[in-house]
């Protein structure tokens, strides 16, 4: 709501509060991260490698209906709150929880950890054929579907599932056309990369920098994409 205000004083105060909150949170992570990643630590937030274990696995058997997991890469919490307003006529939010990414937060490490349910070093040790080192050529996340399958098997979930990655408009339209097939699966995971690509373009392309000159404009641009996206149609 504050983004609608034209009071520069309020905006400056909010900016200072956000900066201070960022600094406090950074110090909090620095103090606690090494203990969070220990296997025997019980007092920790949900992290990348425990996300599916904590939030998805318990729900697989909750219903006869298929479970859909939608991952929008690089989506910030404030962007999610913008999207949520469009979804409220169709969905009821039961829980609005936050999970923490492992470090580093780059896709190669954090997203592989989500689907494997393991820390990167453990992925490399257990599944070397599914791990691409940083210095190696090639896509670093090309085996997410296979890693998801391995994690499901470790939890004894021998179910029919699908993994779908949407990188462009054509892939999104194709996925929308396959919805009747997806409804036959117990679990469907859908990864959308647009927001991540937009984030990178914001730093690399001048025209995107102009369109997303500040946080309000950036949220507006992302919201416009979502409103006209195949993802919104699917949901």
How should each PLM-predicted stretch be described?
Residues 1-235:
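Feature captures the catalytic ectodomains and active-site-proximal regions of enzymes
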């Amino acid at each position: 709501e504050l983004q609608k205000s034209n009071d520069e004083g309020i905006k400056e105060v909010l900016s200072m509060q956000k900066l201070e909150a960022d600094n406090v949170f950074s110090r909090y992570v620095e103090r606690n991260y090494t203990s969070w990643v220990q296997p025997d630590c019980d007092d920790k937030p949900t992290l990348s490698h425990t996300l599916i274990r904590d939030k998805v696995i318990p729900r697989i058997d909750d219903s006869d209906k298929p479970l859909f997991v939608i991952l929008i890469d690089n989506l910030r919490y404030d962007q999610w709150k913008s999207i949520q307003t469009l979804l409220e006529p169709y969905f009821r939010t039961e829980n609005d929880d936050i999970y923490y990414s492992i470090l580093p937060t780059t896709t190669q490490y954090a997203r592989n950890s989500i689907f494997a349910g393991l820390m990167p070093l453990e992925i490399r040790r257990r599944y070397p054929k599914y791990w691409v080192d940083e210095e190696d050529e090639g896509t670093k996340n090309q085996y997410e579907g296979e890693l998801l399958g391995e994690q499901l098997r470790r939890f004894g979930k021998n179910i029919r599932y699908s993994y779908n990655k949407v990188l462009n408009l054509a892939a999104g339209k194709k996925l929308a056309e396959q919805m009747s097939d997806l409804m036959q699966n117990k679990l469907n995971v859908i990864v959308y990369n647009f927001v991540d690509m937009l984030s990178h373009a914001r730093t690399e392309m001048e025209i995107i920098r102009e369109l997303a000159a500040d946080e309000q404009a950036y949220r507006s641009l992302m919201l416009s994409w979502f409103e006209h996206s195949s993802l919104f149609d699917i949901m």
